[in-house]
Swiss-Prot record:
Family named by the database record: Belongs to the tyrosinase family.
Entry protein name: 5,6-dihydroxyindole-2-carboxylic acid oxidase
Residue ranges that the UniProt entry lists as topological domain Lumenal, melanosome: 25-477
Intracellular or extracellular location(s): Melanosome membrane
Sugar-modified residues: N96, N104, N181, N304, N350, N385
Disulfide cross-links: C30-C41, C42-C65, C56-C99, C101-C110, C113-C122, C258-C261, C290-C303
Segments passing through the bilayer: 478-501
Annotated binding of Zn(2+) B, by residue: H377, H381, H404
Ligand binding (Zn(2+) A): H192, H215, H224
Organism: Mus musculus
């Protein structure tokens, strides 16, 4: 590459800051004693006269340091331990001041752009397209697999994770912040774990498990949307490829096989151990993080960057639970998209006629709640029968990415059809973390559920290339068609008889087209599952 001009160091620094988007729990610049004790995370963008001279890019008008706004509206009674969890009123227990960016600027120091924008001034609109993994060319498939593996092995250039709760965050001596580096992909796993972990109530006490900041409530779709957007942007930056996009897995096939579980894609089943991935796949070498639940729950520690055992996966292999041995039907998606109301009281896993609860998979595809049902998103996770079916571990299996991009595609189609009607996304009394204006845990800078409740092509810089299945006829419609067909047949017979009576001349026989196609509506007998109200994925 030829270079004819030498750019000033400040411009080079600005370019690098624009290139690396900040989405971490906390930026590395704020993981220090001074920032934690002050409760201020407003890093400089281009400090020209020493530290603290350009917080949030204020000198160039990109942003300013302001007080954090956290939702204070009441949550539901499912969580009775107010004051015990660092995730409450996120992120006020850690920081009370952060950057507020102007215009299309974004990031922890306003050094980058909002989703859908790029360029030094963040004034160039960009749209990436998420496509079906199976529709990609061989080169595109290989590139995606290599990119995932690179993300697994690349230390995040900007972000660190906390390995202790707030009361122990400064270490035993009070001067050693407990943060660690982590890879780009393992950070994706860690954020999911942190959102679903139990609330530690103290040494010798059982941790409280009926809490989940990203499942079983209205924030399920908005939280996972941002989670994916974070990974996509991180990988774009890692690859230096702004057009890179995450593909999806259309799991609504009705089949008992995983069509993306091949060695050139997500890995086939090992011939040596049916619960492992084939050694011919790069993913057989991956090791999981965040698996030491007993340690976290009894000692009050957090998941760190230590990797453990391999990914386990045995699609359709749970012979003891036939209901999870087959993937959702295409028609399940069609029916789900006909549920017009986003969410309904009690805004939990037992909500009925709720689009959110239906696509999450706690209701039947028609929207009717049934405690024995696991459908759509939940069924796809359970079908994988391994790491991908355990809530705290599921993102360790990279199929998680593909499964959730398709779930997000369904969400985006619903938003398009119903004009992003947020009126039934509750402002209060949802499970903790799920109120409309709650800052989603543990993302940084703070971002609310509302900000993700928008159509993606117009607001978030990406779109889906997907063909939705058509609507089958319902039983009542089939009966109506049959009645109409019978009446037409009677009318035709009567007409022919009348003609024969009126005229004895020989006439050519005419064929009357009839509606004789057989339409079968999808139905499946779901087995009752243990703990039906507990989040499985």
């Amino acid at each position: 590459m030829k270079s004819y001009n030498v750019l000033p160091l400040a411009y080079i620094s600005l370019f690098l800051m624009l290139f690396y988007q900040v989405w971490a729990q906390f930026p590395r610049e704020c993981a220090n004693i001074e920032a934690l004790r002050r409760g201020v995370c407003c890093p400089d963008l281009l400090p020209s006269s020493g530290p603290g001279t350009d917080p949030c890019g204020s000198s160039s008008g990109r942003g300013r340091c302001v007080a954090v706004i956290a939702d204070s509206r009441p949550h539901s009674r499912h969580y009775p331990h107010d004051g015990k969890d660092d995730r409450e009123a996120w992120p006020l227990r850690f920081f009370n001041r952060t950057c507020q960016c102007n215009d299309n600027f974004s990031g922890h120091n306003c050094g980058t752009c909002r989703p859908g924008w790029r360029g030094a001034a963040c004034n160039q609109k960009i749209l990436t397209v998420r496509r079906n993994l199976l529709d990609l060319s061989p080169e595109e498939k290989s590139h995606f697999v290599r990119a995932l593996d690179m993300a697994k092995r690349t230390t995040h250039p900007q972000f660190v994770i906390a390995t202790r709760r707030l009361e122990d965050i400064l270490g035993p001596d009070g001067n050693t912040p407990q943060f660690e580096n982590i890879s780009v992909y393992n950070y994706f796993v860690w954020t999911h774990y942190y959102s679903v972990k139990k609330t530690f109530l103290g040494t010798g006490q059982e941790s409280f498990g009926d809490v989940d900041f990203s499942h079983e409530g209205p924030a399920f779709l908005t939280w996972h949307r941002y989670h994916l957007l974070q990974l996509e942007r991180d990988m774009q930056e890692m690859l230096q490829e702004p057009s890179f996009s995450l593909p999806y897995w259309n799991f609504a096939t009705g089949k008992n096989v995983c069509d993306v579980c091949t060695d050139d894609l997500m890995g086939s089943r090992s011939n040596f151990d049916s619960t492992l991935i084939s050694p011919n796949s790069v993913f057989s070498q991956w090791r999981v993080v965040c698996e030491s639940l007993e340690e976290y729950d009894t000692l009050g520690t957090l998941c760190n960057s230590t990797e453990g055992g391999p990914i386990r996966r045995n699609p359709a292999g749970n012979v003891g639970r036939p209901a999870v041995q087959r993937l959702p039907e295409p028609q399940d998606v069609t029916q789900c998209l006909e549920v017009r109301v986003f969410d309904t009281p009690p805004f939990y896993s037992n909500s009925t006629d709720s689009f959110r609860n239906t696509v999450e998979g706690y209701s039947a595809p028609t929207g009717k709640y049934d405690p024995a049902v696991r459908s759509l998103h939940n069924l796809a996770h359970l079908f994988l029968n391994g790491t991908g079916g355990q809530t705290h571990l599921s993102p360790n299996d990279p199929i998680f990415v593909l499964l959730h991009t398709f779930t997000d595609a369904v969400f985006d189609e619903w938003l398009r059809r119903y004009n992003a009607d947020i009126s039934t996304f509750p402002l209060e009394n949802a499970p903790i973390g799920h109120n409309r204006q709650y800052n989603m845990v543990p993302f940084w800078p703070p971002v609310t559920n509302t900000e993700m409740f928008v159509t993606a092509p117009d607001n978030l810089g990406y779109a889906y290339e997907v063909q939705w299945p058509g609507q089958e006829f319902t039983v009542s419609e089939i009966i109506t068609i049959a009645v109409v067909a019978a009446l037409l047949l009677v009318a035709a017979i009567f007409g022919v008889a009348s003609c024969l009576i009126r005229s004895r001349s020989t006439k050519n026989e005419a064929n009357q087209p009839l509606l004789t196609d057989h339409y079968q509506r999808y139905a499946e007998d779901y087995e009752e599952l243990p703990n039906p109200n507990h989040s499985m994925v």
